[in-house]
Amino acid sequence: MSTEAATYLLSAVAVGLGATLFMDLWALFLNRTFGTPLANYCLVGRWFRHMSEGTFSHTSIASASQKHFECAVGWIAHYVIGAVYALTLVLVSGNWLAQPSLLPALLFGIGTVLVPFLVMQPSFGLGIAASRTPNPTQARLRSLMAHTTFGVGLYVCAVGVRYVVPVHA
């Protein structure tokens, strides 16, 4: 792999990590300002830890047995997933990282909400698009807001990376 290709891929990973942090900081702001509940990434870790035992779907992830290091696994998975999403955007969008624009990042970020809606929430016992939660509309809007913020973060971080590292497609 050439140095230029490695720089490009590492820049994409940096964008993903930064966008995930951007999303988390926005969630923290909403929590501190309006009392909006924070996502529980420990439950994501619990889900991944149960996978090693062959359990991929739960009636209620909150009622599933706790696992050692589930919080660490959940937070690490959260950031790795953010990096993988950014790599995906960069690899399918051609020259976007060298010339970032908001619309592709925003649309991609919004599109990533399909993963929790169609994979994670059903696997957690929450139903497709949180249909089994006490307030599905509120849960859906929170997911959509988080992933929209991730999309904005992709753009903001790509612009930032461009100023630190010369990125060429």
Please tell me what each predicted stretch does:
Residues M1-A169:
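Juxtamembrane/disordered regions of integral membrane proteins
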